[in-house]
Amino acid sequence: TILISVTCILLNMPYPFIPFQMTLLDNFVEGFPSFMILFEKNISKQKESIGRYTMRYSFPNAIAIVLCVIALKLLAPTLSLSLNQAFTILYYTTAILSIHMIYRIYSPINLYRTVVLIVDIVAFVLVSYITYDLLQLAPVTSLLLQYLIMTLLFGLIVSTCLSKIVVHYLDTHPQD
């Protein structure tokens, strides 16, 4: 969120999410999966510090989302995207990239974690559909869907590549 805010200031653009969108993203990315993992029996001790854990999982995703914001800001005029259309793409891209991060955190996947992920995804889609007007999103046309898929693929590639680099670095530079 801080990186997106700084990016928006530097690019002289409005923040791409309204409070209600942030509430939904927070509930389905941070809230529900974190709450549900508490019910899983886990007696093993944390293997790495919170800083290293954050670098391993959150950092690649955060950079990927910021790069998607920058890419859409730069390409929106060329693609004839309105601000609302660009923000709609960013809303869905952020949600999917964040759920992908939850998948990585939950790995290795077991039945319980699979069910939690499926419930999280279905609930996010249903709530987004039910509250579509409140989310102030642009209608998803076939062209907008194509741009969304391209942005999402870009974000997934960036996130995956950065994740591999960060994991390699953390694995070759053990904790002190």
What do the predicted segments below correspond to?
Residues Y106-S107, T160-D176:
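Membrane-interface capping segments at transmembrane-helix boundaries
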Residues N110-T114, L137-A138:
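Interfacial helix-loop-helix linkers and transmembrane-helix boundary segments
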